[in-house]
Amino acid sequence: MKENISMLQTALRFLDEHNEISFATCEGDLPKIRIFQIMRREDNMLYFATSPEKAVWRELQQNPNVELLAYADNISVRCRGMVNFDVEDSVKQWIYDNNSVLSRLYDSWEGMAFFCLPIVELDYYDLTPTPPVFKHFNLKTGEVSNGFVGSRFKSK
């Protein structure tokens, strides 16, 4: 149990350190992926900013189910959940003030669109050790399971 909590914290710290991620939405019934940046993390909540004029904003309004993937040095973290648009003004202001790119692109935070992702499921995959580590965390139910990492390490 304690090992699982530690592994989950390792995965969340990985997101802090690798905040440029692949972000997947749906455009109609087709998947659409782009590079996005996690602007802030509070526990299991990830915050994002975009323009209300961008396609991603319209896609999220139509279908708030998303998945994201961070990857570096043989480690990947994949998160899944449903975004919501209830972001406090103080968080919006903090995001705008603490990201130098946003102030170059936008006059103020008030004209931007913000959303957050409460992580429902998280996969942590590390290919470095033998056998590799693959943990699946369901943060809604609290269940933790080991994922399939290859036939050589399949449970018998």
Stretches with model-predicted labels:
Residues 1-19, 152-153:
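N-terminal leader/targeting segments and the immediate start of mature chains
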